[in-house]
Amino acid sequence: MPELPEVEVVRAGLAPAVTGATILGVEVFELRSLKRHDPLAGSFESLLTGRSMQTPARRGKFLWIPLDSSPRSAIVAHLGMSGQILLRDPGTVENGLLRIRLYIEHPEHGELWVHFVDQRLFGSMAVDALVPTVDGAPAGLGTDEALLPAQVSHIARDPLDPVFDDAAFAAVLARRRSGIKRVLLDQTLISGIGNIYADESLWAARIHYDHPATALSRPRVRTLLAELRRVLGRALAEGGTSFDAQYVNVNGASGYFSRSLHVYGRQGQPCDRCGTAIVRESFMNRGSHFCPRCQRM
């Protein structure tokens, strides 16, 4: 599943192409890709056609593009397991996985097509109302507005958000008896982190994935947050993690952070720090990868 770095790469790639562009038309080829859209608010196509788009924003794994509508609304996209948002020249023939197409015109770049491609259909697009943030601060990366889509309002801030409160997160951990990885994957407590970056950050911080969150000292919490930001930042700089063709940027190119992974997917291989074989254990219907020597309980 695309995590924070992958979604941020898409957001940054979309920004110059869609900011200030007008939506000329919309085609929906797969209604299941609108599962988060409320038809009572109006049809997806009618709510978008003729609207101007503003700078894309992101919180955690959610991406949205504000519209010039009144009342305020936005296109909300979640990539799910295999979703892609691609910028295409008019006339481009996409594969059979094309679910939604936006016809847009930018004052500088001319006409473009925005394609939502999704193999496994866990992703979605929707038009949603913008609501005030709980803390009154800008909603996420890419926006100065304290407004975010209603369906994103329950999502916590992510570690790369300038407004993320380290002390408040430490207080949350102090009240949680569950393992630290379970907390990191809870998008209502801290967002944007999935299996890959949880495993990589915990390895970097030398913390076992099942270590009780409440038992982490403040210095270890500071170390964990620092490693989360370092790992996410490096992944972002390297274009995200691509194991197959399912994750690509807006131009269809893959990221290469998979070459920098220390534990994820490396079970049986030697730890880059101590040489001990990396172990994979079942966890929440997925796997946790760790070094049994560097990350002791």
Swiss-Prot record:
Query: Which Pfam family would be a valid example here?
Result: zf-FPG_IleRS
Gene3D superfamilies noted in UniProt:
1.10.8.50, MutM-like, N-terminal (3.20.190.10)
Enumerate the residue ranges forming zinc fingers (FPG-type).
262-296
InterPro entries in the record, alphabetically?
DNA_glyclase/AP_lyase_DNA-bd, DNA_glyclase_Znf_dom_DNA_BS, Formamido-pyr_DNA_Glyclase, FPG_cat, MutM-like_N-ter, Ribosomal_uS13-like_H2TH, Znf_DNA_glyclase/AP_lyase, Znf_FPG/IleRS
Q: State its cofactor.
A: Zn(2+)
Name a GO molecular-function annotation.
Answer: zinc ion binding
Which UniProt keywords are present, listed alphabetically? Answer: DNA damage, DNA repair, DNA-binding, Glycosidase, Hydrolase, Lyase, Metal-binding, Multifunctional enzyme, Zinc, Zinc-finger
Q: What is its EC number?
A: 3.2.2.23, 4.2.99.18
GO biological process terms, alphabetically, are: base-excision repair
Which residues are responsible for catalysis? P2 (schiff-base intermediate with dna), E3 (proton donor), K61 (proton donor), R286 (proton donor)
Share what the entry says about its subunit structure, partners included: Monomer.
| Similarity comment text for this entry | Belongs to the FPG family.
Its name, as the record gives it, is: Formamidopyrimidine-DNA glycosylase
